[in-house]
Design a protein with these regions (language model features):
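C-terminal segment of classical bacterial N-terminal signal peptides
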Residues: 1-4
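Beta-strand-enriched cores of mature, soluble protein domains
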Residues: 6-163
Length: 163
């Protein structure tokens, strides 16, 4: 299933990953007890035929602060918001907005877990609709490790019938 409207059901989950490049650019500024995080990353999209050959360019802003009792025991919490532009070429583009916060990821490590929504599409993706749960590396993990890490999206995507 490619997630077209007439084939899509609530149970259809389309999983894909953004393999984040090692040349991500982030800055960290102090603001009292918090740090303001901003920057961008790029990556190849893999794992879903509908999005095959796409590149993601994502921008984010957020803050990092000391965890308290309600923060699942994490010493430091990242709270991030961003926009990703997924492009096959200049004409076939998807825009998604997302937000996440430090939580326990699928593998038990600290990850930024949250939600995304597909807000705009052009070309092949005109009329796109849907949302996703996301699990992404923390900004500080990307800064420290300097390795490609995946951002995993579990999406429910629909497109209008193109007859």
């Amino acid at each position: 299933s490619f997630g077209y409207a007439n084939e899509n059901t609530k149970e259809d989950v389309q999983k894909f990953q953004i393999i984040i490049d090692t040349d991500s650019k982030f800055s960290i500024d102090r603001a009292g007890d918090s740090e303001i995080l901003s920057g961008s990353y790029n990556g190849d999209v893999t794992g879903l035929k509908l999005l095959e050959g796409m590149k993601a360019n994502c921008n984010l802003v957020g803050r990092s602060y000391q965890g308290r009792g309600f923060s699942c025991g994490f010493a430091e919490v990242e709270e991030l918001n961003g926009i990703c532009i997924f492009a096959k070429n200049k004409n076939d583009v998807i825009i998604a907005k997302w937000q996440c916060i430090t939580s326990v990821g699928d593998n038990g490590d600290a990850s930024c877990l949250g939600k995304a929504s597909f807000v705009e599409g052009h070309g092949l993706f005109a009329g796109i609709d849907g949302s996703a749960s996301i699990s992404s590396p923390l900004v500080k993990q990307l800064l420290e490790k300097k390795i490609s890490l995946p951002s995993v999206w579990k999406a429910n995507i629909s497109l209008p019938d193109k007859l």
